[in-house]
């Protein structure tokens, strides 16, 4: 069985004059209409609709010639498209049911009466935007909309923007029936937004003991100020650390020139001399206490002459050490370095000093007698007390030397090692 594609066989037989044999031909779908055929309506529609192809049967072409049927048929046609031929009465989807179903829009009301009155146009914009009558002319005055939409349907309203720079209103091409903004629910989020008037409030700033209140400050400006304040507070710890380092370096710079005239010693590492300040302060107080004690007063005065003669610069820095701390730092470093050069000269000088002192004590008071309380403690003993008195006189000097040992003067170490031969003298 051969099939008829595009009505080729029917056209041949119609040209031969036999159209009645194929009147009951059912083309594929089982309908009672004739075969479908391709047509390109380029004459009526124009150049713009030449791209659209429509299926029309011979019955539809014959019906187009009648203006009454064309008015009814054109009412249910799309722009540029033609519906399929009407099915037979025995079909499940008959034409009457289809026409009755198409008379209702989305909201359940008949729309053709309103469409005939209003024409579905507002501000020159058609409901479909493409099928306007001025685009596709039709012989009938009825609109060419198969499913028109009502004005009261809120789901199909689209906002129309205000006038553009050119002055012409913006046109929406699909489902635009109005440009109302207040009654529409499409495209609105959270109510109307006022971007020109943002939220403003008061801002209070506490700075330098003052309270500053500013009115009408937006939230964005307040956030920017807070961000700037947080950034400005970050680099403060490094700057404080740099400031704390500066006094140490300044003190180190001050100690070096003060130490040069005293000992003529260049301190190469001033950092090592800084921690010694706390350790040197205690020996200074010990020396001052030792000088004020009545027991060691005479011995310190006696020992001041030979010591100052041997090393004249050893006592003067100590007398000047009490007002300021950087000076004893330099003197202790100098005194710790210099005594290494003259250990033997100290030993001989100390031995001679002790011998002369013992001779003076024995010549002045060979026997015990009532003396002042300062000297009675040194001379208490039996009649043979020259050696004992000499030993007791040595002890304050040794205590004074031990006190001076804390200042970094190791000259008393040699004296303690040579104490037995120097003190025991046979008469």
UniProtKB/Swiss-Prot annotation:
| Biased segments, Polar residues type | 317-327, 369-402, 411-427
Kindly state which keywords UniProt assigns to this record, in alphabetical order.
Jasmonic acid signaling pathway, Nucleus, Transcription, Transcription regulation, Ubl conjugation
Subcellular location(s): the record lists: Nucleus
PTM remark: Ubiquitinated. Targeted for degradation by the SCF(COI1) E3 ubiquitin ligase-proteasome pathway during jasmonate signaling.
- Quote the biased-composition stretches of kind Pro residues, using this chain's numbering: 136-146
What GO biological process terms does the UniProt entry carry, in alphabetical order? regulation of defense response; regulation of jasmonic acid mediated signaling pathway; response to wounding
The principal location of this protein is nucleus
According to the record, the residues making up region (Disordered) are 1-32, 128-154, 296-327, 361-427
Biased composition range(s): Basic and acidic residues: 1-25
CC terms in the record's Gene Ontology section = nucleus
Regarding protein family, the annotation reads: Belongs to the TIFY/JAZ family.
The free-text domain remark for this protein reads: The jas domain (343-367) is required for interaction with COI1.
Role noted for this protein: Repressor of jasmonate responses.
Complex formation = Interacts with COI1A. Interacts with COI1A and COI1B in a coronatine-dependent manner. Coronatine is an analog of jasmonoyl isoleucine (JA-Ile).
Please give the name of this protein.
Answer: Protein TIFY 6a
- Higher taxonomy: Eukaryota, Viridiplantae, Streptophyta, Embryophyta, Tracheophyta
């Amino acid at each position: 069985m051969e099939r008829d594609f595009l009505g080729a066989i029917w056209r041949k037989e119609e040209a031969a004059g036999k159209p009645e044999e194929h009147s009951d031909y059912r083309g594929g779908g089982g309908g009672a209409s004739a075969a479908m055929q391709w047509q390109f309506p380029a004459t009526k529609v124009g150049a713009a609709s030449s791209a659209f192809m429509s299926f029309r049967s011979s019955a539809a072409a014959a019906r187009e010639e009648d203006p009454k049927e064309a008015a009814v048929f054109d009412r249910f046609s799309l722009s540029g498209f033609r519906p399929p031929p009407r099915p037979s009465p025995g079909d499940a989807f008959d034409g009457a049911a289809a026409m009755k179903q198409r008379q209702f829009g989305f909201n359940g009301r008949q729309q053709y009466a309103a469409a005939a009155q209003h024409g579905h146009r507002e501000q020159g914009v058609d409901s479909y935007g493409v099928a306007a009558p001025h685009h596709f002319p039709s012989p009938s005055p009825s609109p060419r909309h198969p499913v028109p939409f009502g004005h009261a349907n809120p789901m199909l309203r689209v906002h129309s923007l205000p006038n553009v720079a050119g002055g012409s209103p913006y046109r929406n091409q699909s489902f635009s029936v109005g440009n109302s903004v207040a009654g529409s629910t499409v495209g609105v989020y959270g109510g109307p937004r006022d971007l020109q008037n943002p939220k403003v409030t008061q801002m209070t700033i506490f700075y330098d003991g003052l309270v500053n209140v500013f009115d009408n400050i937006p939230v964005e400006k307040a956030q920017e100020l807070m961000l700037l304040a947080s950034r400005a507070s970050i680099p403060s710890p490094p700057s404080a650390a740099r400031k704390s380092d500066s006094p140490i370096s300044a003190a180190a710079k001050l100690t070096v020139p003060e130490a040069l005239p005293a000992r003529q010693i260049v301190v190469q590492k001033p950092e090592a001399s800084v921690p010694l300040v706390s350790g040197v302060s205690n020996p200074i107080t010990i020396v001052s206490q030792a000088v004020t004690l009545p027991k060691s007063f005479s011995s310190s005065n006696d020992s001041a002459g030979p010591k100052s003669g041997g090393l004249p610069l050893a006592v003067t820095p100590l007398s000047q050490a009490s007002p300021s701390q950087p000076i004893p730092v330099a003197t202790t470093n100098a005194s710790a370095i210099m005594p290494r050069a003259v250990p033997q000269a100290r030993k001989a000088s100390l031995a001679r000093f002790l011998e002369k002192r013992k001779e003076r004590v024995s010549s002045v008071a060979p026997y015990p007698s009532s003396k002042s309380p300062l000297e009675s403690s040194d001379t208490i003993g039996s009649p043979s007390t020259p050696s004992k008195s000499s030993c007791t006189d040595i002890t304050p000097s040794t205590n004074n030397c031990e006190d001076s040992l804390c200042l970094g003067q190791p000259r008393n170490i040699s004296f303690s090692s040579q104490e037995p031969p120097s003190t025991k003298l046979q008469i």
